[in-house]
């Protein structure tokens, strides 16, 4: 078989089971595959497993048998090829010991070539012949049990038990005599059955070994850009129930190339499996601390600042436009160009509520006058911005858009005397709505990658707000075999 599909799904689509305690208190992104998701994974696994077996050629079989009144016949079966497999029933069960996949009542069709040579004292001249035959395999059962455990942030996959059993087979000759058919049935039935069983069992071993190697190659950290990296190391062991599989990753952002040291955040203990009554394959939950860690990393790196020297209304960036609002500014710097140096003064405060994501952002806007090539700071206005963040799923990323709720301004310092803040507030409102929020939304719409493997995509995703978690309830669709060639399935 080719079991990689299901177990890649199990190891990368994360956690959400009702009342589950997180596998480890440091897991801030978590999720589960529901029974619907497991059925999808099982069917996809079987489909891909069959594809890997069809056209598989089995080893040549040679045997001899005594034909009554004729003599000894040497028969060789070659080009034994599995043409197709049909599955009648299957099941994927989870339990404390791991995953159990069972396929029962399967049938398979084989093609082969035969040749024989016959000699005896009655027939001094040897007789030989050749032809083709088809084989129908019935009552085939395939099963495997695997265990998935966490070791230092990496998942280890262990094959505990596996096997294939062939119940019955029938052979149809193209050419040959009736005695040869009976000879094939009597002498070769066990050989053909064993060859099928061993070939499928070997495919299972190969698949588990390749998948285990793939799991070991998964990165523990993914660089998002030149500033930040996402900690995707697994925490705790997978939690298996009779209808779902739960796994968690650390999920926090760190400065790029920074050692993966847990940050001090208050831990969430439980999350709900509810998807608002929607039967979805997976549910991925993201703790608000993921967003807080992103806020802290980009703030500490000095990335939350912007210099504005162009505006839709360019007149705002000239002291002449301010002559009635701040006369002393125009008096001291008549008709000089200006720029606005905008910087976030502290890491934005982010909190998931039961309706949306709330954000409080403290911004300092320093007014600079450009005179004779010199940048002259003349005043600083602080703004407290309250906004809501509407989460969206764009491709396989979680992104969103800020919506302004309210804002307030006050004068932080001034070199040009007292300012009339009521008059200035309208100008700041224009800057906020035309520059600051569009700029932030441009950055936010890039989003953060959700842990799903290449080749799969979210389908009909719904967003739920369950303080302090954001939950993505979604089905998934399989787009192709791109993932097979990737060493780093998280990357898109």
Regions found by a protein language model. Give the residues of each.
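Extended, low-charge, aliphatic-rich alpha-helical segments
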Residues: 2-111, 158, 165-492
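Mobile, glycine-rich extracellular loop/lid and propeptide segments
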Residues: 126-128
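Extended, solvent-exposed, non-transmembrane regions
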Residues: 141-143, 281
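Short beta-strand micro-motifs enriched in acidic
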Residues: 145-151, 390-394
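Electropositive, elongated alpha-helical scaffolds characteristic of BAR/F-BAR
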Residues: 153-157
């Amino acid at each position: 078989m080719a079991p990689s599909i299901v177990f890649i799904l199990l190891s990368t689509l994360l956690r959400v089971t009702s009342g589950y305690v997180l596998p480890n208190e440091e897991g801030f992104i978590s999720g589960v595959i529901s029974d619907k998701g497991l059925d999808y994974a099982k069917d996809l696994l079987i489909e891909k497993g069959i594809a890997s077996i069809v056209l598989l050629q089995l080893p040549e079989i040679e045997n001899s048998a005594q034909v009554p009144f004729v003599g000894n016949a040497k028969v060789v079966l070659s080009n034994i090829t599995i043409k197709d497999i049909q599955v009648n029933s299957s099941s994927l069960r989870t339990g404390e010991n791991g995953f159990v996949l069972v396929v029962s009542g399967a049938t398979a069709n084989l093609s082969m070539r035969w040749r024989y040579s016959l000699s005896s004292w009655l027939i001094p001249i040897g007789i030989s012949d050749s032809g083709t035959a088809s084989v129908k395999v019935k009552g085939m059962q395939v099963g495997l049990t695997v265990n998935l455990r966490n070791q230092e942030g990496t998942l280890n996959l262990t094959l505990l038990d596996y096997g294939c059993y062939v119940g019955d087979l029938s052979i149809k000759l193209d050419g040959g005599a009736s005695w040869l058919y009976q000879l094939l049935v009597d002498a070769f039935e066990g050989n053909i059955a064993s060859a099928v069983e061993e070939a499928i069992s070997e495919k299972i071993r190969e698949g588990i070994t390749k998948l285990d190697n793939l799991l070991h190659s998964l990165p523990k950290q993914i660089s998002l850009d030149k500033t930040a990296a996402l900690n995707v190391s697994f925490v705790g062991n997978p939690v298996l129930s009779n209808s779902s599989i739960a796994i968690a990753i650390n999920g926090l952002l760190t400065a790029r190339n920074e050692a993966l040291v847990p940050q001090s955040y208050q831990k969430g203990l439980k999350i709900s499996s509810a998807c608002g009554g929607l039967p979805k394959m997976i549910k991925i939950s993201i703790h608000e601390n993921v967003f807080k860690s992103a806020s802290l990393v980009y703030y500490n790196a000095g990335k939350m600042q912007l210099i504005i020297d162009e505006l839709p209304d360019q007149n705002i960036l000239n002291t002449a436009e301010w002559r009635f609002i701040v006369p002393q500014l125009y008096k001291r710097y008549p008709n000089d160009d200006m720029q606005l140096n905008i910087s976030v003064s502290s890491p934005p405060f982010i909190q998931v509520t039961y309706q949306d994501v709330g954000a409080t952002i403290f911004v300092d806007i320093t007014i600079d006058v450009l005179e004779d090539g010199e940048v002259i700071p003349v005043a600083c206005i602080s703004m407290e911005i309250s906004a809501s963040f509407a989460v969206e799923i764009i491709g396989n990323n979680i992104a969103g858009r800020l919506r302004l709720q309210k804002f307030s301004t006050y004068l932080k310092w001034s070199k040009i005397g007292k300012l009339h803040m009521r008059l200035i507030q309208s100008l700041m409102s224009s800057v906020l709505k035309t520059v600051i929020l569009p700029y932030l939304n441009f950055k936010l719409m890039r989003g953060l990658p959700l842990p799903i493997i290449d080749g799969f995509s979210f389908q009909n995703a719904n967003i739920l707000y369950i303080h302090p978690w954001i939950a993505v309830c979604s089905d998934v669709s399989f787009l192709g075999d791109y993932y097979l060639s990737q060493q780093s399935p998280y990357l898109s």
